Amino acid sequence: MSKTRKIIHIDMDYFFAQVEEKANPSLKDKPFAVGGTNPKRGVISTCNYIAREYGVRSAMPTAIAMQKCPNLILLNTDFAKYKATSAVIRDIFYSFTDKVEPLSLDEAYLDVTDVKEYKNSATLIAQAIKQEIFNKTGLTGSAGVAPNKLLAKIASDINKPNGLYVITPEQVDSFVKDLPVKKLFGVGKVSQEKLKNMNVETCLDLQQLSLATLVDKFGKFGSSLYNYARGIDNREVNPVRIRKSVSVENTYLEDLKTLEACLEKLPNLYNKLTSRMTEEHYKSIIGIVVKFTDTKFNKTSLTRVAKTLDKKVLKNLIIELHQKQNYHIRLIGIGIKLGEIDDRQLSLVF
Protein backbone atom coordinates (compact mmCIF):
# COMPACT_ATOMS: atom_id res chain seq x y z
CA MET A 1 0.00 0.00 0.00
CA SER A 2 1.38 3.43 -0.94
CA LYS A 3 1.96 6.03 1.74
CA THR A 4 -0.86 8.53 2.25
CA ARG A 5 0.36 11.90 1.04
CA LYS A 6 0.11 15.11 3.03
CA ILE A 7 -0.36 18.12 0.76
CA ILE A 8 -0.73 21.76 1.78
CA HIS A 9 -2.02 24.49 -0.52
CA ILE A 10 -1.24 28.02 0.64
CA ASP A 11 -3.15 30.89 -0.95
CA MET A 12 -2.36 34.40 0.25
CA ASP A 13 -5.43 36.52 0.99
CA TYR A 14 -6.11 39.30 -1.57
CA PHE A 15 -2.34 39.37 -2.05
CA PHE A 16 -1.66 42.49 -4.15
CA ALA A 17 -4.20 44.48 -2.15
CA GLN A 18 -2.92 43.16 1.16
CA VAL A 19 0.65 44.17 0.28
CA GLU A 20 -0.62 47.67 -0.57
CA GLU A 21 -2.62 47.75 2.67
CA LYS A 22 0.49 46.85 4.64
CA ALA A 23 2.47 49.60 2.92
CA ASN A 24 -0.33 52.14 3.48
CA PRO A 25 -2.43 51.24 6.57
CA SER A 26 -4.82 54.14 5.89
CA LEU A 27 -6.34 51.97 3.13
CA LYS A 28 -7.43 49.29 5.60
CA ASP A 29 -10.90 50.69 6.24
CA LYS A 30 -11.58 51.85 2.68
CA PRO A 31 -12.73 49.99 -0.43
CA PHE A 32 -9.84 49.81 -2.88
CA ALA A 33 -8.63 47.76 -5.81
CA VAL A 34 -5.30 47.15 -7.50
CA GLY A 35 -5.00 47.50 -11.27
CA GLY A 36 -7.58 48.73 -13.72
CA THR A 37 -6.80 52.40 -13.18
CA ASN A 38 -8.11 53.21 -16.65
CA PRO A 39 -11.85 53.65 -15.92
CA LYS A 40 -12.88 52.87 -19.52
CA ARG A 41 -10.69 49.91 -20.47
CA GLY A 42 -9.20 48.78 -17.15
CA VAL A 43 -9.71 45.44 -15.43
CA ILE A 44 -9.40 44.92 -11.67
CA SER A 45 -6.52 42.63 -10.61
CA THR A 46 -7.71 42.20 -7.03
CA CYS A 47 -9.43 44.15 -4.27
CA ASN A 48 -9.76 44.15 -0.51
CA TYR A 49 -12.66 42.55 1.33
CA ILE A 50 -14.43 45.86 1.92
CA ALA A 51 -14.64 46.35 -1.85
CA ARG A 52 -15.90 42.79 -2.21
CA GLU A 53 -18.83 43.62 0.04
CA TYR A 54 -19.95 45.98 -2.74
CA GLY A 55 -19.68 43.18 -5.30
CA VAL A 56 -16.29 44.14 -6.72
CA ARG A 57 -14.31 41.12 -7.91
CA SER A 58 -11.01 40.20 -9.56
CA ALA A 59 -11.06 40.36 -13.39
CA MET A 60 -14.05 42.73 -13.28
CA PRO A 61 -14.01 45.67 -15.73
CA THR A 62 -13.22 48.85 -13.84
CA ALA A 63 -16.32 50.59 -15.21
CA ILE A 64 -18.57 47.95 -13.63
CA ALA A 65 -16.56 47.99 -10.39
CA MET A 66 -17.01 51.77 -10.13
CA GLN A 67 -20.76 51.40 -10.68
CA LYS A 68 -20.96 48.93 -7.83
CA CYS A 69 -18.68 50.98 -5.57
CA PRO A 70 -18.45 54.67 -6.58
CA ASN A 71 -15.97 55.36 -3.75
CA LEU A 72 -13.59 52.63 -4.91
CA ILE A 73 -9.94 53.71 -4.71
CA LEU A 74 -7.84 52.49 -7.64
CA LEU A 75 -4.12 51.79 -7.24
CA ASN A 76 -1.52 51.08 -9.90
CA THR A 77 0.05 47.63 -9.72
CA ASP A 78 3.55 47.53 -8.24
CA PHE A 79 4.95 44.16 -9.29
CA ALA A 80 8.41 44.86 -7.89
CA LYS A 81 6.86 45.16 -4.44
CA TYR A 82 4.72 42.04 -4.88
CA LYS A 83 7.65 39.97 -6.17
CA ALA A 84 9.83 41.02 -3.24
CA THR A 85 7.14 39.98 -0.76
CA SER A 86 6.50 36.77 -2.66
CA ALA A 87 10.20 35.90 -2.46
CA VAL A 88 10.11 36.18 1.33
CA ILE A 89 7.05 33.91 1.47
CA ARG A 90 8.58 31.39 -0.91
CA ASP A 91 11.73 31.18 1.21
CA ILE A 92 9.49 30.36 4.16
CA PHE A 93 7.97 27.48 2.18
CA TYR A 94 11.44 26.11 1.41
CA SER A 95 12.40 26.29 5.08
CA PHE A 96 9.79 23.58 5.69
CA THR A 97 10.23 21.32 2.65
CA ASP A 98 12.04 21.02 -0.67
CA LYS A 99 8.84 19.87 -2.33
CA VAL A 100 7.30 23.22 -3.24
CA GLU A 101 5.36 23.90 -6.43
CA PRO A 102 4.70 27.64 -6.84
CA LEU A 103 1.61 28.38 -8.90
CA SER A 104 1.90 32.17 -8.91
CA LEU A 105 3.25 34.97 -6.73
CA ASP A 106 0.65 34.26 -4.06
CA GLU A 107 0.03 30.51 -3.97
CA ALA A 108 1.86 27.20 -3.89
CA TYR A 109 1.55 23.51 -3.16
CA LEU A 110 3.78 21.88 -0.55
CA ASP A 111 4.24 18.15 -0.09
CA VAL A 112 5.05 17.63 3.61
CA THR A 113 4.57 13.86 3.65
CA ASP A 114 8.16 13.23 4.78
CA VAL A 115 8.60 16.23 7.09
CA LYS A 116 9.41 14.83 10.51
CA GLU A 117 9.05 18.04 12.48
CA TYR A 118 5.76 19.13 14.05
CA LYS A 119 4.99 15.49 14.86
CA ASN A 120 4.72 14.84 11.11
CA SER A 121 1.36 16.65 11.29
CA ALA A 122 0.44 18.52 8.12
CA THR A 123 -2.05 20.56 10.14
CA LEU A 124 0.62 21.73 12.59
CA ILE A 125 2.98 22.46 9.70
CA ALA A 126 0.33 24.55 7.93
CA GLN A 127 -0.29 26.50 11.14
CA ALA A 128 3.44 27.10 11.53
CA ILE A 129 3.79 28.28 7.92
CA LYS A 130 0.89 30.71 8.28
CA GLN A 131 2.37 32.08 11.51
CA GLU A 132 5.84 32.44 10.00
CA ILE A 133 4.41 34.30 7.00
CA PHE A 134 2.58 36.68 9.33
CA ASN A 135 5.66 37.17 11.52
CA LYS A 136 7.89 38.06 8.57
CA THR A 137 5.50 39.96 6.31
CA GLY A 138 2.51 40.98 8.42
CA LEU A 139 0.28 39.28 5.83
CA THR A 140 -2.26 36.50 6.18
CA GLY A 141 -2.76 33.49 3.97
CA SER A 142 -5.20 30.61 3.94
CA ALA A 143 -4.20 26.95 3.96
CA GLY A 144 -5.84 23.76 2.80
CA VAL A 145 -4.57 20.40 4.02
CA ALA A 146 -5.56 17.18 2.25
CA PRO A 147 -4.21 13.92 0.81
CA ASN A 148 -3.87 15.42 -2.69
CA LYS A 149 -3.55 18.64 -4.67
CA LEU A 150 -7.16 18.74 -5.84
CA LEU A 151 -8.64 18.72 -2.35
CA ALA A 152 -5.92 20.86 -0.75
CA LYS A 153 -6.62 23.70 -3.19
CA ILE A 154 -10.37 23.45 -2.66
CA ALA A 155 -9.86 23.37 1.12
CA SER A 156 -7.73 26.53 1.17
CA ASP A 157 -10.68 28.53 -0.16
CA ILE A 158 -13.18 27.39 2.46
CA ASN A 159 -12.30 29.51 5.50
CA LYS A 160 -10.83 32.61 3.82
CA PRO A 161 -9.42 34.98 4.90
CA ASN A 162 -6.69 33.73 7.25
CA GLY A 163 -8.27 30.29 7.22
CA LEU A 164 -7.21 26.70 7.67
CA TYR A 165 -9.30 23.75 6.54
CA VAL A 166 -8.28 20.11 6.84
CA ILE A 167 -9.64 17.14 4.89
CA THR A 168 -8.38 13.88 6.36
CA PRO A 169 -8.27 10.69 4.26
CA GLU A 170 -11.27 9.40 6.21
CA GLN A 171 -13.30 12.51 5.32
CA VAL A 172 -12.67 12.47 1.56
CA ASP A 173 -15.74 10.45 0.55
CA SER A 174 -18.21 12.52 2.57
CA PHE A 175 -16.54 15.80 1.57
CA VAL A 176 -16.74 15.29 -2.19
CA LYS A 177 -20.34 14.05 -2.37
CA ASP A 178 -21.89 17.51 -1.97
CA LEU A 179 -19.05 19.33 -3.71
CA PRO A 180 -20.20 21.34 -6.77
CA VAL A 181 -18.48 20.08 -9.92
CA LYS A 182 -17.50 23.65 -10.77
CA LYS A 183 -14.96 23.38 -7.93
CA LEU A 184 -13.06 20.58 -9.67
CA PHE A 185 -9.72 21.30 -11.31
CA GLY A 186 -10.14 21.87 -15.04
CA VAL A 187 -13.91 22.41 -14.98
CA GLY A 188 -14.55 25.75 -16.65
CA LYS A 189 -17.75 27.34 -17.90
CA VAL A 190 -17.99 25.10 -20.98
CA SER A 191 -17.46 21.85 -19.05
CA GLN A 192 -19.78 23.03 -16.30
CA GLU A 193 -22.55 23.77 -18.79
CA LYS A 194 -22.01 20.44 -20.50
CA LEU A 195 -22.27 18.62 -17.16
CA LYS A 196 -25.35 20.61 -16.22
CA ASN A 197 -27.02 19.44 -19.43
CA MET A 198 -26.27 15.91 -18.22
CA ASN A 199 -28.01 16.72 -14.90
CA VAL A 200 -24.67 16.78 -13.10
CA GLU A 201 -24.13 19.54 -10.55
CA THR A 202 -22.38 17.77 -7.67
CA CYS A 203 -19.67 15.15 -7.42
CA LEU A 204 -22.28 12.67 -6.20
CA ASP A 205 -24.14 13.24 -9.48
CA LEU A 206 -20.88 12.79 -11.35
CA GLN A 207 -20.18 9.51 -9.57
CA GLN A 208 -23.26 8.02 -11.21
CA LEU A 209 -21.66 8.27 -14.66
CA SER A 210 -19.41 5.49 -15.89
CA LEU A 211 -15.81 6.01 -16.93
CA ALA A 212 -16.73 5.06 -20.49
CA THR A 213 -19.47 7.70 -20.62
CA LEU A 214 -17.19 10.44 -19.31
CA VAL A 215 -14.38 9.56 -21.72
CA ASP A 216 -16.90 9.53 -24.58
CA LYS A 217 -18.21 12.98 -23.64
CA PHE A 218 -14.99 14.66 -22.49
CA GLY A 219 -12.15 12.68 -24.04
CA LYS A 220 -9.01 12.29 -21.93
CA PHE A 221 -10.35 14.77 -19.36
CA GLY A 222 -13.18 12.31 -18.70
CA SER A 223 -10.75 10.02 -16.85
CA SER A 224 -9.71 12.91 -14.62
CA LEU A 225 -13.34 13.80 -13.93
CA TYR A 226 -14.05 10.20 -12.96
CA ASN A 227 -11.25 10.29 -10.39
CA TYR A 228 -11.85 13.85 -9.17
CA ALA A 229 -15.50 13.03 -8.43
CA ARG A 230 -14.18 10.42 -5.99
CA GLY A 231 -11.59 12.71 -4.44
CA ILE A 232 -8.74 10.97 -6.27
CA ASP A 233 -5.87 13.02 -7.66
CA ASN A 234 -2.50 11.41 -8.33
CA ARG A 235 -0.76 14.55 -9.58
CA GLU A 236 2.58 15.04 -7.84
CA VAL A 237 3.83 18.27 -6.31
CA ASN A 238 6.48 19.28 -8.85
CA PRO A 239 9.34 21.30 -7.36
CA VAL A 240 10.72 23.88 -9.76
CA ARG A 241 13.71 25.06 -7.76
CA ILE A 242 16.87 23.38 -6.57
CA ARG A 243 17.35 24.24 -2.93
CA LYS A 244 20.42 26.41 -2.26
CA SER A 245 20.41 26.30 1.53
CA VAL A 246 18.94 24.72 4.64
CA SER A 247 18.75 26.80 7.80
CA VAL A 248 17.12 27.11 11.19
CA GLU A 249 16.88 29.97 13.64
CA ASN A 250 15.54 30.74 17.09
CA THR A 251 14.37 34.03 18.55
CA TYR A 252 14.87 34.14 22.31
CA LEU A 253 12.60 35.74 24.88
CA GLU A 254 15.57 36.97 26.91
CA ASP A 255 18.67 38.63 25.49
CA LEU A 256 21.78 36.46 25.20
CA LYS A 257 24.26 38.72 26.95
CA THR A 258 27.41 36.58 26.81
CA LEU A 259 29.29 34.37 24.39
CA GLU A 260 28.68 31.42 26.70
CA ALA A 261 24.93 32.01 26.53
CA CYS A 262 25.11 31.96 22.73
CA LEU A 263 27.18 28.78 22.64
CA GLU A 264 24.70 27.04 24.95
CA LYS A 265 22.08 27.37 22.20
CA LEU A 266 24.20 25.59 19.59
CA PRO A 267 23.29 21.94 20.43
CA ASN A 268 19.55 22.56 20.07
CA LEU A 269 20.01 24.52 16.84
CA TYR A 270 22.31 21.80 15.49
CA ASN A 271 19.72 19.11 16.22
CA LYS A 272 16.99 21.16 14.52
CA LEU A 273 19.16 21.69 11.46
CA THR A 274 20.13 18.03 11.07
CA SER A 275 16.48 16.98 11.44
CA ARG A 276 15.70 19.05 8.32
CA MET A 277 18.58 17.69 6.28
CA THR A 278 18.30 14.80 3.84
CA GLU A 279 21.05 12.47 2.62
CA GLU A 280 21.36 14.58 -0.53
CA HIS A 281 21.89 17.71 1.56
CA TYR A 282 24.86 16.11 3.35
CA LYS A 283 26.41 15.27 -0.03
CA SER A 284 25.94 18.80 -1.39
CA ILE A 285 27.34 20.97 1.43
CA ILE A 286 29.66 23.72 0.22
CA GLY A 287 29.42 26.14 3.11
CA ILE A 288 28.33 26.70 6.71
CA VAL A 289 26.61 29.89 7.85
CA VAL A 290 25.89 31.52 11.21
CA LYS A 291 23.87 34.69 11.68
CA PHE A 292 22.96 36.93 14.61
CA THR A 293 20.27 39.54 15.10
CA ASP A 294 20.65 41.82 18.11
CA THR A 295 18.05 43.69 20.15
CA LYS A 296 18.36 46.66 17.76
CA PHE A 297 17.57 44.35 14.80
CA ASN A 298 21.08 44.66 13.40
CA LYS A 299 21.89 41.55 11.35
CA THR A 300 25.31 40.04 10.73
CA SER A 301 26.42 36.71 9.32
CA LEU A 302 29.54 34.71 8.56
CA THR A 303 30.06 31.91 6.05
CA ARG A 304 32.85 29.36 5.78
CA VAL A 305 33.58 27.09 2.85
CA ALA A 306 33.07 23.52 4.04
CA LYS A 307 32.10 20.11 2.68
CA THR A 308 30.73 18.71 5.94
CA LEU A 309 28.54 19.98 8.75
CA ASP A 310 31.07 20.42 11.55
CA LYS A 311 30.05 21.50 15.06
CA LYS A 312 33.53 22.92 15.66
CA VAL A 313 33.22 25.19 12.64
CA LEU A 314 29.81 26.36 13.84
CA LYS A 315 31.22 27.04 17.29
CA ASN A 316 34.15 29.02 15.88
CA LEU A 317 31.80 31.03 13.66
CA ILE A 318 29.66 31.91 16.67
CA ILE A 319 32.76 33.03 18.59
CA GLU A 320 34.01 35.13 15.66
CA LEU A 321 30.60 36.64 15.00
CA HIS A 322 30.11 37.48 18.67
CA GLN A 323 33.39 39.40 18.63
CA LYS A 324 32.19 41.42 15.64
CA GLN A 325 28.72 42.11 17.05
CA ASN A 326 29.21 42.78 20.72
CA TYR A 327 25.57 43.49 21.51
CA HIS A 328 22.92 41.51 23.31
CA ILE A 329 21.76 38.82 20.89
CA ARG A 330 18.07 38.08 20.35
CA LEU A 331 18.24 35.64 17.40
CA ILE A 332 20.73 32.99 16.30
CA GLY A 333 20.53 31.15 13.00
CA ILE A 334 22.71 28.40 11.56
CA GLY A 335 22.61 26.78 8.15
CA ILE A 336 24.35 25.13 5.24
CA LYS A 337 24.89 26.26 1.66
CA LEU A 338 24.19 23.71 -1.06
CA GLY A 339 25.11 23.23 -4.70
CA GLU A 340 27.54 25.05 -6.93
CA ILE A 341 27.86 28.74 -6.21
CA ASP A 342 30.93 30.92 -6.32
CA ASP A 343 32.86 32.43 -3.42
CA ARG A 344 31.24 35.81 -3.92
CA GLN A 345 27.81 34.28 -3.37
CA LEU A 346 29.03 32.54 -0.24
CA SER A 347 29.39 35.93 1.44
CA LEU A 348 25.68 36.68 1.08
CA VAL A 349 23.43 36.74 4.16
CA PHE A 350 21.14 33.72 4.11
Curated annotation (Swiss-Prot):
Q: Which GO terms describe its biological process?
A: DNA-templated DNA replication; error-prone translesion synthesis; SOS response
Its gene name is dinB
Q: What protein am I looking at?
A: DNA polymerase IV
Q: Which InterPro entries match?
A: DNA/RNA_pol_sf, DNA_pol_Y-fam_lit_finger_sf, DNA_pol_Y-fam_little_finger, DNA_polymerase-Y, DNApol_IV, IMS_HHH_1, Rev_trsase/Diguanyl_cyclase, UmuC
- What does this protein's UniProt record list under function? Poorly processive, error-prone DNA polymerase involved in untargeted mutagenesis. Copies undamaged DNA at stalled replication forks, which arise in vivo from mismatched or misaligned primer ends. These misaligned primers can be extended by PolIV. Exhibits no 3'-5' exonuclease (proofreading) activity. May be involved in translesional synthesis, in conjunction with the beta clamp from PolIII.
List its EC numbers. Answer: 2.7.7.7
Q: Which residues form the UmuC domain?
A: 7-188
State the active site.
E107
Reaction(s) the record says it catalyses: DNA(n) + a 2'-deoxyribonucleoside 5'-triphosphate = DNA(n+1) + diphosphate
Q: How is the cofactor bound?
A: Binds 2 magnesium ions per subunit.
List the NCBIfam families hit by this protein, alphabetically.
PRK02406.1
Q: Name one Pfam family in it.
A: IMS
Tell me which residues are marked as the site Substrate discrimination: F16
Q: Which cofactors are required for activity?
A: Mg(2+)
Q: Which GO terms describe its cellular component?
A: cytosol
Gene3D superfamilies found in the cross-reference section: 3.30.70.270, 3.40.1170.60, 5' to 3' exonuclease, C-terminal subdomain, DNA polymerase, Y-family, little finger domain
Regarding protein family, the annotation reads: Belongs to the DNA polymerase type-Y family.
**Gene Ontology terms, MF aspect:** damaged DNA binding; DNA-directed DNA polymerase activity; magnesium ion binding
Which UniProt keywords are present, listed alphabetically?
Answer: Cytoplasm, DNA damage, DNA repair, DNA replication, DNA-binding, DNA-directed DNA polymerase, Magnesium, Metal-binding, Mutator protein, Nucleotidyltransferase, Transferase
Write out the residues that bind Mg(2+). D11, D106
- What's the subunit arrangement here? Monomer.
Phylogenetic placement of the source organism: Bacteria, Pseudomonadati, Pseudomonadota, Gammaproteobacteria, Thiotrichales
Q: Where does the UniProt annotation locate this protein? A: Cytoplasm
